[in-house]
């Protein structure tokens, strides 16, 4: 099934499909002029161009950091809105863990340091991600892979929006306060999700899912609210690492460690790569000569036009199935226990 060409100038050529979800499809494309590979996320025009899509584009556009997938531009096809971004050749961090089973403490720290670097930058730009998870962390193709945070569809900017209170995110990664349906600090909730990511890298399983009943959503939520987790005996990690996890997995967000405290933690600082030490002091507001930044006005005009169903759009261009369940609506802790959570063990042990 062919995606229509990019409007009238047909800048990109298709290389291959690289993913699909409830948003549509993602494709690897090549810039015909520069030969650069880019990832293009296609979202069907019409009702799917909602507030989440607009928020993702506007927030993502403002972020320029080595640990965040670079936004390039948005374009229109006759049937789709296309979001063009940096291509991360190494795939998802999730896949890497699945292949490995779990990481050594040093390897987990290597990726966690980069994750915190990217999240810290987002927070400094007054943007909380709200859906941090392994599937939203990509890797470039280098031998010592650089982690890249992606997917800002649930992100919230305190400069543009009120404090978040909706329950969004992926079940296994949700912080206790997010389940309360009251206002919460999205930055502190992001810290919890970073902790879940660290735990999964170390253990190869989600911290708050019952290994005997991983799809029992009600039980998962109960374990999150009571902070019921443990580190299996077969996983050998340092006292310092256990201490950091215990400071992240704190139900009261006011008592939870924050990003700056994580960056000063003994475990985090060990073997910290030199290029991460002074990232906070650098400016990454560079311009790509091949992709001069689009103005907010131009982007909003394109988004507005994309809300109108294009000629030739069928309304069912892509299937609606999606493997990982993101929560777009408020969560009821007493929901039907048969509702699937984010999944079973990341890999069979």
From Swiss-Prot:
GO terms for molecular function: ATP binding; protein serine kinase activity; protein serine/threonine kinase activity. Residues 12-268 form the Protein kinase domain. The keyword Phosphoprotein applies. Transmembrane segments: none annotated. Residues 151-177 are annotated as: Activation loop. Keywords: ATP-binding, Kinase, Nucleotide-binding, Phosphoprotein, Serine/threonine-protein kinase, Stress response, Transferase. Induction: Up-regulated in response to NaCl treatment. Belongs to the protein kinase superfamily. Ser/Thr protein kinase family. This is Serine/threonine-protein kinase SRK2A. The lineage of its organism: Eukaryota, Viridiplantae, Streptophyta, Embryophyta, Bryophyta.
């Amino acid at each position: 099934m062919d995606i229509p060409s990019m409007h009238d100038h047909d800048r990109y050529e298709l290389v291959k499909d690289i993913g699909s979800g409830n948003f549509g499809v993602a494709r690897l494309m090549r810039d015909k002029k520069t030969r650069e590979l880019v990832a293009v996320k296609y979202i069907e025009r019409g009702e799917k161009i909602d507030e989440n899509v607009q928020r993702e584009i506007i927030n993502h556009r403002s972020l320029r950091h080595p640990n965040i997938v670079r936004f390039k531009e948005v374009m229109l096809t006759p049937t789709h809105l296309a979001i063009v971004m940096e291509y991360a050749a190494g795939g998802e961090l999730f896949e890497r863990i699945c292949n490995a089973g779990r990481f050594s403490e040093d390897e987990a720290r290597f990726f966690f340091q980069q994750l915190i670097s990217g999240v810290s930058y987002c927070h400094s730009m007054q943007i909380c991600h709200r859906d941090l998870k392994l599937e939203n962390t990509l890797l470039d193709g280098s031998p010592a892979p650089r982690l890249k945070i992606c997917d800002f569809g649930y992100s919230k900017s305190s400069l543009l929006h009120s404090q978040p209170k909706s329950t969004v995110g992926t079940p296994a990664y949700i912080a206790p306060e997010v389940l309360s349906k009251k206002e919460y600090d999205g930055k502190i909730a992001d810290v919890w999700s970073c902790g879940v990511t660290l735990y999964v890298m170390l253990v190869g399983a989600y911290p708050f899912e019952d290994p005997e009943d991983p799809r029992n959503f009600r039980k998962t939520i109960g374990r999150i609210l009571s902070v019921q987790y443990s580190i299996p005996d077969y996983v050998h990690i340092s006292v310092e690492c256990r201490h950091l996890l215990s400071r992240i997995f704190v139900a009261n967000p006011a008592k939870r460690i924050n990003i700056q405290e994580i960056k000063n933690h003994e475990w985090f600082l060990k073997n910290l790569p030199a290029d991460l030490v002074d990232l906070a002091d650098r400016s990454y507001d560079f311009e790509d000569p091949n992709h001069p930044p689009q103005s907010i006005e131009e982007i909003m005009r394109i988004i507005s036009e994309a809300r109108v169903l294009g000629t030739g759009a069928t309304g069912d261009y892509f299937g609606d199935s999606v493997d990982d369940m993101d929560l777009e609506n408020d969560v009821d802790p007493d929901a039907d226990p048969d509702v699937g959570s984010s999944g079973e063990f990341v890999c069979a042990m």
